[in-house]
């Protein structure tokens, strides 16, 4: 019975811990009031995960399963089981038995009750004798003296026992099994702020793009309307934890199978709220509001953490061998907007897969950009297949080949190379202060096309730039190159390492620059939500979000100076 009670109590503790962990994550999604700004330690678009895993000690091997027939020891085993009350009762009983024994052996056994008064009087008289030598001289070491000695010794022993029990620390709670623990990891970052000016900046604005952590999954259910309510299909939907103390809701904007006729999709209130936020969030900024907001890191931080990340649950892609085509296992293309390669084998879904999404442009124009991950060795051929298939005229690369570890494979040739029948030739390389421009020709059969490859090299390792003009200059160069392609330019491919952080900054800046020129206002919040609908995690960190605001603030000042007075 005691074992069953202890086990029930441990299960209750485990349930409380699980609910507490979920509550911590839920509560950490939104930051209504923040006492201090934040600097998030981040690695570019999730590339630091491998380094952090390398530095962390390996987890201890799992303990062998215990014999189910062997019951665990009861709670409190091996520790003191005596309480204060039991000690006092023991003391009283021992003194009573001691008194009875002494009286019995001293001849008072038959009439001890009759001589109780005399015994007490003898004890009081004995206590009044202050001269201990008088006891020895007078020979009064009789029954009362022995009784007093035994009482004193017993009192000292029992008092010592009680004092020891009172000082004994309470028994620690029984540790829960590892599988019953739910921990809400909270990492509170710090923040360093500096103004983004064309002049030299004194303090760097640190930005390490966040490591992509494995999502923690809630459960939502897909259920047929006419089916038995007891037969439910449980489907995992992801919650991606942002680096820092904030958990961003991950919602799948197009779950495969949800739109099939005869099936209903039951969304959780949190997911429904996140979907509604991405579709409706907006904050139009006039020029003065833009400048003020760019200088308010607290407001930008709070606004950024309100935006759902919209990452994809890896379980959405049940394609064997898919891991070989993803640079990061948790950064996947959203299904509804992903690029599908033409494949000679329609029964092989892996041959048509590439980690890339179509991204809408200014005014919701479809397929203006393609956001993709930095190619890896096993996807270089797929990357060039996509370039040829989409008639891409421009590629923008915003990462170095290595930043602590490999961020992108050098997928272009020194002179010439061929992939799947497409001949790639580098015609010319132009070096500028902030980027390198390669003029490339693509040829397949008798068809030949031109391609411009911009490699932006001014983005510092492991942080955001401390100056906005280089990125603005690149955006303007790419816009002019796209205008030369005509009114119906094919999608512009933009990539970094994971294809969400720096890539999101570039595309958001390009869209907002067009909006600022056309409307005189800018809505960076709405633009960010639009990007995350198409590809989860775009503009990955708070620092990148602030950087986009500073770039747009600088661009608005440039436009106001260029406008006729």
From Swiss-Prot:
Where does the record place it? Endoplasmic reticulum membrane
Its topology with respect to the membrane? Multi-pass membrane protein
Q: Which GO terms describe its biological process?
A: protein dephosphorylation; signal transduction
**What residues form the catalytic site here?**
496
One GO cellular component term noted in the UniProt record for this chain:
membrane
Coarse class of the primary localization is: endoplasmic reticulum
What EC number(s) does this enzyme carry?
Answer: 3.1.3.48
Instruction: Using the record, list the residue span of the signal peptide; answer none if the entry has no such feature.
Output: none
UniProtKB keywords: Endoplasmic reticulum, Hydrolase, Membrane, Phosphoprotein, Protein phosphatase, Transmembrane, Transmembrane helix
Q: Name one GO molecular function term.
A: phosphotyrosine residue binding
Where is the chain membrane-spanning?
Answer: 88-108, 146-166
Annotated substrate binding lies at 461, 496-502, 540
* Highest taxon in the source lineage: Eukaryota
Skewed-composition ranges (Pro residues): 56-75
Task: Write out the ranges of the annotated region (Disordered).
Answer: 1-80, 169-189
Where composition is biased (Basic and acidic residues), the residues are: 1-16
What reaction is this protein's catalytic activity?
Answer: O-phospho-L-tyrosyl-[protein] + H2O = L-tyrosyl-[protein] + phosphate
Q: Where is the Tyrosine-protein phosphatase domain?
A: 300-555
**Protein family according to the UniProt entry:** Belongs to the protein-tyrosine phosphatase family. Non-receptor class subfamily.
What is the purpose of this protein?
A: May regulate the activity of several effector molecules involved in synaptic plasticity and neuronal cell survival, including MAPKs, Src family kinases and NMDA receptors.
* PANTHER family linked to this entry: PROTEIN-TYROSINE-PHOSPHATASE, TYROSINE-PROTEIN PHOSPHATASE NON-RECEPTOR TYPE 5
Put simply, this protein is called Tyrosine-protein phosphatase non-receptor type 5
Please name the gene that encodes this protein: PTPN5
């Amino acid at each position: 019975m005691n074992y069953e009670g202890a086990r029930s109590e441990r299960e209750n503790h485990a349930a409380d811990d699980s609910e507490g962990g979920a509550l911590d994550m839920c509560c950490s999604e939104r930051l209504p009031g923040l006492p201090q700004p934040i600097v998030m330690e981040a690695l570019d678009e999730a590339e630091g995960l491998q380094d952090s895993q390398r530095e962390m000690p390996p987890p201890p091997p799992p303990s062998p399963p215990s014999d189910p027939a062997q019951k665990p020891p009861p709670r409190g085993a091996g520790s003191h089981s005596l309480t204060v009350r039991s000690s006092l009762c023991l003391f009283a009983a021992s003194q009573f038995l001691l008194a009875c024994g002494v009286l019995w052996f001293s001849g008072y056994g038959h009439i001890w009750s009759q001589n109780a008064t005399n015994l007490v009087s003898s004890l009081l008289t004995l206590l009044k004798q202050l001269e201990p030598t008088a006891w020895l001289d007078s020979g009064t070491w009789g029954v009362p003296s022995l009784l007093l000695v035994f009482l004193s010794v017993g009192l000292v022993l029992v008092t010592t026992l009680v004092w020891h029990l009172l000082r004994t620390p309470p028994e620690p709670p029984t540790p829960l099994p590892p599988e019953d623990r739910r921990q809400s990891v909270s990492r509170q970052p710090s923040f360093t702020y500096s103004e983004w000016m064309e002049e030299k900046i004194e303090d760097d604005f640190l930005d390490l793009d966040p490591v992509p952590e494995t999502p923690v999954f809630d459960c939502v259910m897909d259920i047929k309307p006419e089916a038995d309510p007891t037969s439910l299909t449980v489907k995992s939907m992801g919650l991606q934890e942002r680096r820092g103390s904030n958990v961003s809701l991950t919602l799948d904007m197009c779950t495969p199978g949800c739109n099939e006729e005869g099936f209903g999709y039951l969304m959780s209130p949190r997911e429904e709220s996140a979907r509604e936020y991405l579709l409706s969030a907006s904050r139009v900024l006039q020029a003065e509001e833009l400048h003020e907001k760019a200088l308010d890191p607290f407001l930008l931080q709070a606004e950024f953490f309100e935006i759902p990340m919209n990452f994809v649950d890896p379980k959405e892609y049940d394609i064997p061998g898919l891991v070989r085509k993803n640079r990061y296992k948790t950064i996947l293309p959203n299904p509804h907007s992903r690029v599908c390669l033409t494949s000679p084998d329609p029964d092989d879904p892996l041959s048509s897969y590439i980690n890339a999404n179509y991204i809408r442009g200014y005014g919701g124009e479809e397929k203006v950009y393609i956001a993709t991950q930095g190619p890896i060795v096993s996807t270089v051929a797929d990357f060039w297949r996509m370039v040829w298939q989409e008639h891409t005229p421009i590629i923008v690369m915003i990462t170095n080949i290595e930043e602590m570890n490999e961020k992108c494979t050098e997928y272009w040739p020194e002179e010439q190379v061929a992939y799947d029948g497409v001949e790639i030739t580098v015609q010319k390389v132009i070096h500028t202060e902030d980027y390198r421009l390669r003029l490339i020709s693509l040829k397949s059969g008798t068809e030949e096309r031109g391609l411009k490859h911009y490699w932006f090299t001014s983005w510092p390792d492991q942080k955001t730039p401390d100056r906005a003009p280089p990125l603005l200059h690149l955006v303007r160069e790419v816009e002019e190159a796209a205008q030369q392609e005509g009114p119906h330019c094919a999608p512009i491919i933009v990539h970094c390492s994971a294809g969400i952080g720096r890539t999101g900054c570039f595309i958001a800046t390009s869209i907002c620059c067009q909006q600022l020129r056309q409307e005189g206002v800018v809505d960076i919040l709405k633009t960010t939500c639009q990007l995350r609908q198409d590809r989860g995690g775009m503009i990955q960190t708070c620092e990148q979000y602030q950087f986009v605001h500073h770039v747009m603030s600088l661009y608005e000042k440039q436009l106001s100076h260029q406008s006729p007075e």
